[in-house]
Amino acid sequence: MARVKRGVIARARHKKVLKQAKGYYGARSRVYRVAKQAVIKAGQYAYRDRRQRKRQFRALWITRINAGAREFGLSYSRFISGLKKASIEIDRKVLADLAVRDKDAFAELARIAQG
């Protein structure tokens, strides 16, 4: 049986990593050893930030709802509590959108939340 040399496999692996590192600055896009580390780190950041994105958007929505509610003399917590008591189930994403784009609808919700 013939001996298998790994040149083809190594080249393919290197090409794959360098393709993933395309657009990186300097050696990070050209030197395999550096590019591999950069790609691994980028993957870790991407994994972490996919989870953080959910937290950040929720925080943004809450901030917008709070700002909208305070225009009607309500704090965020009292506004949400009032909606729950009135058995209105609108998620924070939609509430934030209403607070920014549809002031009249949000005002109606605030009136309901006040009791």
Swiss-Prot record:
Pfam families, per database record: Ribosomal_L20
A Gene Ontology term for the protein's cellular component: ribonucleoprotein complex
Keyword match RNA-binding: yes
Keywords per UniProt: Ribonucleoprotein, Ribosomal protein, RNA-binding, rRNA-binding
InterPro entries: Ribosomal_bL20, RIBOSOMAL_L20_CS, Ribosomal_protein_bL20_C
GO biological process, one term: ribosomal large subunit assembly
Molecular function in Gene Ontology: rRNA binding; structural constituent of ribosome
HAMAP family assigned to the protein according to its UniProt record, in alphabetical order: Ribosomal_bL20 (MF_00382)
Family classification: Belongs to the bacterial ribosomal protein bL20 family.
Function: Binds directly to 23S ribosomal RNA and is necessary for the in vitro assembly process of the 50S ribosomal subunit. It is not involved in the protein synthesizing functions of that subunit.
The protein's name: Large ribosomal subunit protein bL20
Organism: Methylococcus capsulatus (strain ATCC 33009 / NCIMB 11132 / Bath)
Lineage start: Bacteria, Pseudomonadati, Pseudomonadota, Gammaproteobacteria, Methylococcales
